[in-house]
Amino acid sequence: GPESSGKTTLFNELKTLSGFNFISEYSRTYIDKINRPYQYNDILEIAKFYVKEIETARINKRSLISDTDLLTLLIWCEYKYDKCHSFIKESLTKNPPDLYLVCSPNIPWEYDPQRENPNNRVELFDIYLKKINELGIDFEIIEGNNSKRLIQAKNILQNIHL
């Protein structure tokens, strides 16, 4: 889902589940590390990290829960720069996830210096749903307060990870 939609909060709560590999949001770490405003090509470097982590999870034959992924990077590139690296598009279509849990922006915006779109969350949410549908990937919308979101997500994951 879009910025400030509860992805990281939900991700951190799901890390208690066993049988999964977890990928934290690398974009924040990368942007903090470069010590300058990010640029278009930085998103490609972030994508390379995610692809490596996805490949590691596949080699280990473990299900993967990711705070953000290549879809987020694809939308980020297209929304901000009106273009996207072919590596991101190809990697996403080559190894699509089995399911997206898409966090609804129905919770209050929380300021963060790396966040850029406080007024565009519903628009971005719609873009996520459109892209996921275009890619033909299953998804579930996660909404409500944090405890409801966690219950929803755990129920979904338990049903597909029997």
Question: Where are the model-predicted features located?
Answer:
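The conserved Walker
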Residues: 3
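Conserved lysine of the Walker
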Residues: 7
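Conserved substrate/cofactor phosphate-moiety recognition/catalytic segment
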Residues: 12-55
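Anion (oxyanion) recognition and catalysis
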Residues: 16, 58, 133
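Anionic group-transfer/hydrolysis microenvironments
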Residues: 26, 68-71, 104-106
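Glycine-rich phosphate-binding loop used to anchor ATP phosphates in small-molecule kinases
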Residues: 44-95, 114
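A glycine- and Lys/Arg-enriched "phosphate-lid" helix/loop adjacent to the NTP-binding pocket
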Residues: 81-148, 152-155, 161
